[in-house]
Regions:
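ATP-binding glycine-rich phosphate-binding loop
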Residues: 1-26, 37-38
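Active-site beta-strand-loop-beta-strand hairpin of nuclease catalytic cores
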Residues: 25-28, 180-182
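ATP-binding pocket architecture of kinase catalytic cores
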Residues: 26-107
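ATP-dependent phospho-/nucleotidyl transfer catalytic cores
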Residues: 34, 109-171, 215-219, 275, ...
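Active-site acidic catalytic loop and adjacent metal/ATP-binding pocket
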Residues: 61, 154-199
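A glycine-centered beta->alpha junction motif in the catalytic cores
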Residues: 73-89, 120-130, 237-260
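Active-site Asp-x-Gly
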Residues: 180-226
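ATP/Mg2+ or Mg2+-diphosphate-binding catalytic cores
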Residues: 242-284
Length: 284
């Protein structure tokens, strides 16, 4: 379908998670299922804005036959993206740069319900196993404990901010791995959600894969638009670890992928203590 619809002739096609990708003349293309609620015109506008903002370093949508951007195959819709990304690590400025304001947001409440369900589902699923996943058994209580503290704090904030918080369009980092640099500049990875969530996910990315630049972190405390208590709550919730647990129990990933979370527990705790002190957060 790729050659017929896009006039591209890759020698080999690869699959990763729920997408396929291939190379033509050293250019990388990614095909994903299109499940966005927003219309294609809105997505194209966002793509063009990102391309201009990043000076040509964001991924772009590729039209097919008849200048159609959405391709239907076996009752599903797909979009083809050409990857234009700098081969470097993601920076805090990237997250700030791509954030766009949007009103009428209830993301905190939606995230709260999503997180509660995720933990319930994981705890239920793990009852099916005995000694199959020793690394999970050794670490799950610790990470769920942190996450439940985050849920408790988000619940308090959700009640206090009902119909008051301003929403944003943020860049979403879906996975913590060394191959996700291109995710940031992909228009399909922009979503309506809390700005603090984007910042928390960026910090997790730095802790688990790289190192924390504390000079860079000072910029967060200079931004008076950030709700530091909410950011702290999102830091407590271990979304990447828990998402990987789900994938492991579904045989989509190997258990060894959670090693980075286990090995960096002290580094993560040190950052939580640093952030709580800087933001004057008292959980007692």
């Amino acid at each position: 379908m790729i050659s017929e619809n896009y006039n591209l002739f890759p020698e080999k096609i690869y699959k990763k998670d729920n997408e396929i990708y291939f190379f033509v003349n050293d250019d990388k293309y990614v095909m994903r299922e299109y499940v966005k609620k927003s219309g294609i015109d809105e997505l194209l506008q966002l793509s063009n804005e990102m391309y201009e903002k990043t000076k040509g370093n964001s991924s772009v949508l590729i039209p097919g036959v008849g200048n159609n951007y959405v391709y239907e195959y076996k009752r599903k819709k797909y979009i083809l993206i050409k990857v234009n990304s700098i081969e470097r690590n993601i920076l805090l400025d990237d997250i700030i740069y791509l954030t766009r304001s949007k009103s009428d947001n209830d993301s905190t409440t939606k995230n709260l319900e999503k997180y509660k369900k995720q933990i319930d589902d994981i705890e239920t699923k793990l009852l099916e196993f005995n000694k199959e996943y020793p690394k999970i058994q050794q670490s799950i209580d610790y990470f769920i404990g942190l996450s439940e503290n985050g849920i408790q704090l988000l619940g308090k904030l959700s009640r206090e901010e009902k119909n008051q918080n301003e929403g944003t369009i943020i860049a979403k980092i879906e996975n913590i791995d060394e191959y996700n640099n291109e995710e940031l500049n992909n228009p399909l990875n922009m979503e309506k959600n809390d700005y603090e969530l984007a910042l928390a996910n960026y910090i997790k990315y730095r802790i688990y894969l790289l190192h924390v630049d504390y000079d860079e972190m000072e910029n967060i405390f200079r931004n008076d638009k950030i709700n530091h208590l909410k950011l702290y709550a999102y830091l407590l919730y271990q979304n990447y670890y828990l998402s990987d647990i789900v994938k492991i129990t579904r045989n989509k990933k190997e258990e060894k992928i959670i090693k980075k979370y286990i090995d960096n527990r002290k580094k993560y705790l040190d950052f939580l203590l640093y952030y709580a002190e800087k933001a004057k957060i008292n959980m007692k």
